[in-house]
């Protein structure tokens, strides 16, 4: 068991949350019991994740996507009321870490994604160093790499580019980072991988020759929150359980 305060201090210091300009609060979002012995992780603080945390008798739900975002209505009604009420009813804490959890060099979503896909990280760049670039250990065709990504992430990616195109240098950023495609193009990489795609990326890929893969917002962000919880569990002797959803987005 660990005091909630000590656990949150460790997370904040590990992820260096004070260094980031974020559009979501990082840290405790819903307060529950004072001591933490069991953590449930989830990409998002969905009602399904909360119900699972209740079933597991968890003390903390640790997520990447919390329930509060800048520029949204500051009201607690409807689905948000139901989620928060369930947490409060069972005295469960909910903490979320957003951009700091994307960017951490070992525990973050980008680092964990690279480990699973076999990317060797050589550089962090772009806005708040949220993008990563590096080289494949062995060059692959775009088609072969897309098949590998599908196998690892268990989700069919959206691929823009010729399947036979050789891929050596890759840039990536988990989640909804399609807006950084031009930044990746400027790095001179062969491929940019992220979680989502918008209409404009199709044209940019075709007109610049830089391949683009959208591998799923949820799928590319499963692993950071798990790594953070498992690291904390080693430090504090906690029990950890992971929740996942079949989210196609």
Swiss-Prot record:
This is GTP cyclohydrolase 1 type 2 homolog. A divalent metal cation 1 binds at residues 64, 102, 221. NCBIfam families: YbgI_SA1388 (TIGR00486). The keyword Membrane does not apply. GO terms for cellular component: cytoplasm. Disulfide bonds: none annotated. Keywords: Metal-binding. Homohexamer. Belongs to the GTP cyclohydrolase I type 2/NIF3 family. One of its GO terms (molecular function) is metal ion binding. The keyword Metal-binding applies. A divalent metal cation 2 binds at residues 65, 217, 221.
């Amino acid at each position: 068991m660990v005091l909630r305060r000590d656990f949150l201090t460790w997370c904040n210091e590990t992820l260096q949350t004070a260094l980031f300009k974020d559009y979501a609060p990082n840290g405790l979002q819903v307060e529950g019991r004072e001591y933490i012995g069991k953590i449930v992780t989830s990409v998002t603080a969905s009602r399904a994740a909360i119900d699972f945390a209740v079933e597991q008798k968890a003390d903390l739900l640790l997520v990447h996507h919390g329930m509060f975002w800048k520029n949204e209505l500051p009201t607690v009604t409807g689905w948000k009321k139901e989620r928060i009420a369930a947490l409060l009813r069972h005295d469960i804490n909910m903490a979320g870490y957003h951009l700091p959890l994307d960017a951490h060099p070992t525990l973050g979503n980008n680092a964990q994604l690279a480990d699973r896909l076999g990317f060797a990280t050589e550089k962090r760049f772009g806005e708040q160093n949220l993008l990563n670039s590096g080289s494949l250990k062995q060059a692959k065709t775009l088609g072969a790499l897309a098949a590998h990504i599908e196998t690892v992430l268990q989700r069919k990616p959206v691929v823009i580019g010729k399947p036979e195109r050789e891929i050596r240098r890759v840039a990536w950023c988990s989640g909804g980072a399609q807006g950084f495609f031009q930044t990746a193009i400027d790095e001179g990489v062969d491929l940019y991988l992220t979680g989502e795609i918008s209409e404009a990326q199709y044209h940019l890929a075709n007109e610049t020759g830089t391949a683009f893969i959208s591998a799923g917002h949820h799928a590319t962000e499963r692993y950071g929150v798990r790594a953070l919880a498992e690291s904390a569990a080693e430090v504090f002797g906690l029990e950890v359980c992971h929740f996942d959803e079949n989210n196609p987005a």
